[in-house]
């Protein structure tokens, strides 16, 4: 068989709650679908279920908006309580014209600091990003190794917008046990010309591929990618974030 990738969606996960064994839930759902893990698989998991398992869910009923949150909410015509949560999850505000773009404590630049109303029960509930997505990925990789005996790489994905293109795409916000970047500098193209600047965001590309099977309403928060060739590595998704001193727009 020629080399290629195969992707397997893992549907049927129940609503995840704080403290649940996410590795067991995923493994059980895979078994129900007749799927088993193999060494070298990459498991892409939606951020939302990781956040729920870690208790990163906030009831807006408990939030008291600050004066700054109320000011921004009036300007943006948003719930001031949700804006307050965004401010608490942010290092700084980058834009507040039509949407609130912030830099999170992780260093991500995204809308609303990743605070999200979707796919969480209740009108006044929001989810937050995991505190340390790379650590979350490593803990999940270790737990699945114990349960399956297989060494599986993990990517935690979330959907981000892009400044100059329409539409959302899935990116890696956490990773474990695989290279997140493919540095091709120093190699040559097919014409023998040296590559001097090419670094591929491999983890983001894998997250985007899995995102085609996840969707927003399909109830498929986990996807197995099989056939991707890589050497195990201890790189973190945090290393994909461009340093501020190299960023022309921040």
Predicted regions: what they are:
Residues 1-250:
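N-terminal and secondary-structure boundary signal
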């Amino acid at each position: 068989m020629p080399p290629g990738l195969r992707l397997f969606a893992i549907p049927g996960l129940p609503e995840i709650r704080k403290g649940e064994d996410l590795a067991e839930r995923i493994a059980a759902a895979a078994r129900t679908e007749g799927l088993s893990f193999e060494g070298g698989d990459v498991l892409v998991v939606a951020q939302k279920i990781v956040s729920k398992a870690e208790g990163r869910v906030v009831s807006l009923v408990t939030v008291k908006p600050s004066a700054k949150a109320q000011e921004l909410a009036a300007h943006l015509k948003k719930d001031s309580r949700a804006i307050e949560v965004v401010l608490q999850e942010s290092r700084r505000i980058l834009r507040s014209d039509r949407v609130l773009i912030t830099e999170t404590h992780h260093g991500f630049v995204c809308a609303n600091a990743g605070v999200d109303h979707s796919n969480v029960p209740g009108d006044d509930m929001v989810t937050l990003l995991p505190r340390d997505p790379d650590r979350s990925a490593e803990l999940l990789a270790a737990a699945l190794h114990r349960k399956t005996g297989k060494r599986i790489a993990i990517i935690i994905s979330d959907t981000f917008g892009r400044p100059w293109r329409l539409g959302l795409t899935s990116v890696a916000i956490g990773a474990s046990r695989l290279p997140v970047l493919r540095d091709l500098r120093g190699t040559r193209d097919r014409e023998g010309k040296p590559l001097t600047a090419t670094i591929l965001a491999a983890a983001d590309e894998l997250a985007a591929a899995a995102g085609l099977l996840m969707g927003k309403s399909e109830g498929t928060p986990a996807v197995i990618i099989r056939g991707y060739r890589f050497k195990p590595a201890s790189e973190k998704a945090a290393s994909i974030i461009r340093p501020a001193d190299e960023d022309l727009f921040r």
